[in-house]
């Protein structure tokens, strides 16, 4: 599915809402901390389960925790400790947009993630 070249905001939004899951990973980018940015030479990476993030905007600003779940359909992440009480009195995760967090520690850097880092490092130079 090609990315639309239209300037119309409505068509841009339509693409975001109807994008297939394999393209939604690109929407899950979050900036890296200064230390990680210097170490890897990359400004942003897609958030994954197991990454440690610091929330920089919203109700839970300043909270740091590990990513418990990544929801590609809703384009939200769920961080340990960022919970609210629902109407039944149970704790549930508060959905956070990935652009509102900073990755402070990468969980697992496997072959696929290393490939992404190498590819993006070339683009930055």
Swiss-Prot record:
<keyword id="KW-0687">Ribonucleoprotein</keyword>
<protein>
    <recommendedName>
        <fullName>Large ribosomal subunit protein uL24</fullName>
    </recommendedName>
</protein>
<comment type="subunit">
    <text>Part of the 50S ribosomal subunit.</text>
</comment>
<dbReference type="InterPro" id="IPR041988">
    <property type="entry name" value="Ribosomal_uL24_KOW"/>
</dbReference>
<dbReference type="GO" id="GO:0006412">
    <property type="term" value="P:translation"/>
</dbReference>
<dbReference type="InterPro" id="IPR005756">
    <property type="entry name" value="Ribosomal_uL24_euk/arc"/>
</dbReference>
<keyword id="KW-0694">RNA-binding</keyword>
<dbReference type="GO" id="GO:0015934">
    <property type="term" value="C:large ribosomal subunit"/>
</dbReference>
<dbReference type="GO" id="GO:0019843">
    <property type="term" value="F:rRNA binding"/>
</dbReference>
<dbReference type="InterPro" id="IPR014722">
    <property type="entry name" value="Rib_uL2_dom2"/>
</dbReference>
<dbReference type="GO" id="GO:0003735">
    <property type="term" value="F:structural constituent of ribosome"/>
</dbReference>
<dbReference type="InterPro" id="IPR005825">
    <property type="entry name" value="Ribosomal_uL24_CS"/>
</dbReference>
<comment type="function">
    <text>Located at the polypeptide exit tunnel on the outside of the subunit.</text>
</comment>
<keyword id="KW-0699">rRNA-binding</keyword>
<dbReference type="InterPro" id="IPR005824">
    <property type="entry name" value="KOW"/>
</dbReference>
<comment type="function">
    <text>One of two assembly initiator proteins, it binds directly to the 5'-end of the 23S rRNA, where it nucleates assembly of the 50S subunit.</text>
</comment>
<keyword id="KW-0689">Ribosomal protein</keyword>
<dbReference type="Pfam" id="PF16906">
    <property type="entry name" value="Ribosomal_L26"/>
</dbReference>
<comment type="similarity">
    <text>Belongs to the universal ribosomal protein uL24 family.</text>
</comment>
<dbReference type="InterPro" id="IPR008991">
    <property type="entry name" value="Translation_prot_SH3-like_sf"/>
</dbReference>
<dbReference type="Pfam" id="PF00467">
    <property type="entry name" value="KOW"/>
</dbReference>
């Amino acid at each position: 599915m090609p990315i639309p070249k239209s300037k119309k905001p409505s068509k841009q939004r339509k693409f975001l809402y109807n994008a297939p899951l394999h393209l939604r990973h690109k929407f899950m980018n979050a900036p890296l901390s200064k230390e990680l940015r210097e170490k890897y030479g990359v400004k942003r990476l897609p958030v994954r389960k197991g990454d440690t993030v610091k929330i920089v905007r919203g109700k839970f600003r300043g909270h740091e925790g590990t990513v418990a779940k990544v929801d590609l359909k809703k384009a939200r992440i769920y961080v340990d400790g960022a919970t609210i009480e629902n109407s039944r009195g149970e704790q549930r995760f508060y959905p956070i947009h990935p652009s509102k967090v900073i990755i402070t520690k990468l969980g697992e850097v496997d072959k696929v993630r290393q490939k992404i880092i190498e590819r993006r490092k070339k683009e930055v130079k």
